[in-house]
Amino acid sequence: NPRPRLFRLPADRAIVNRMGFNNDGSAAVAERLARRADREHADVLLGINIGKTKAVPVEDAVEDHRLSTRRLARFADYLVVNVSSPNTPGLRDLQAVEPLRPILAGVRDEAADATGREVPILVKIAPDLADDDIAAVAGLVGELGLAGVVATNTTITRDGLRTDAREVEALGAGGLSGPVLRTRAVEVLRLLRTELDRDRTVISVGGVDSAADVEHRLSLGADLVQAYTAFVYEGPQWPGRVLADLAAGERS
């Protein structure tokens, strides 16, 4: 999407973004990952996110996902199917079970064909889904034998912000992230842990700002925790500080 496309809301430690899936495409990424495979640190776990290309019609979404999977699955320790970005027109419509089923099944099958192994597949969902729809996605994950769910992406709501509403409106469209997302992200985590079998993975993301947030998500059944907005505000040493705080908590 055209710039400007990323905005800070300092009063809320939040971000509004309408980045879109701006990248060089799966073919170029595959070339870079092939070079990485021969380098130091190639043993670091690598999760690869894929999503529908903006220019691809919704009716061609299955094949578009299969193409990305065909090119990238061999490099992935796990794959995430992102159908929840608010910045690609029509993408969130693919979260409904009927259009989502062939996409996820196609990615699963393509990954197995391309690698000769079972690549863990997760689906990334929006916080704006109704609880019934979240439960339906969880059911689909079980039905297709997928690894789990990443919850959640950014929200299109603007509720609970300290920043003046006129200032927020002037920024335009985009997904909102940061601490304001925490309450809903926790609600979705609780719901997924109820709906999914315990051997399915839940990666919790949204409003994670501290070691206490990480500990809380893990206590509610998250298997992994992700963060982004706090990284932007706190800088590249922030993850290390969180890990140090977690380790100190374990020692105490």
Language-model region placement:
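Conserved, mostly hydrophobic/aromatic
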Residues: 29, 81-82, 124, 149, ...
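Active-site glycine- and acidic-residue-rich loops that bind
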Residues: 53-66, 92-95, 99, 122-143
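C-terminal helical cap(s) of enzyme catalytic domains, especially alpha/beta-barrels
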Residues: 1-12, 159-174, 229-252
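Glycine-rich phosphate-binding active-site loops on the catalytic face of alpha/beta enzymes
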Residues: 148-158, 207-208, 214-241
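Glycine/Thr-rich beta-alpha phosphate-binding loop at enzyme active sites
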Residues: 86-99, 140-198, 237-238, 242
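Short beta-strand/loop segments at the ligand-binding rim of alpha/beta enzyme cores
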Residues: 41-48, 113-129, 194-204
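A gly/proline- and charged-residue-enriched helix-loop-helix capping module
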Residues: 1-42
